[in-house]
Amino acid sequence: MIEVLANDRLGKKIKVKCMPTDTIGDLKKIISLQIGTSYEKIVLKKGYQVYKDHITLDDYEVHNGFNFELYYS
């Protein structure tokens, strides 16, 4: 179990506990439940890297304490 953070840079930081085998799409669904926004409208980025829904956190080498940038589309 790892804990990751999503920051929308508007004052909202979301902590999420998930497994390394979860996909980015699964992570978006968990975040959407906490913020009340549809998961289809969430975009997770880090720098210029946009994370794709079907790839696992382990494949992206996301570790405990990782910070995502949360954007709305």
From Swiss-Prot:
GO molecular function, one term: protein tag activity
GO term, biological process aspect, one: mRNA cis splicing, via spliceosome
Recorded GO CC terms: cytoplasm; nucleus
Coiled coil: none
Keyword Nucleotidyltransferase: no
UniProt keyword annotation of Iron present: no
Residue stretches making up the Ubiquitin-like domain: 1-73
Top-level taxon of origin: Eukaryota
Keywords: Ubl conjugation pathway
Name listed for the protein in its UniProt record: Ubiquitin-like modifier HUB1
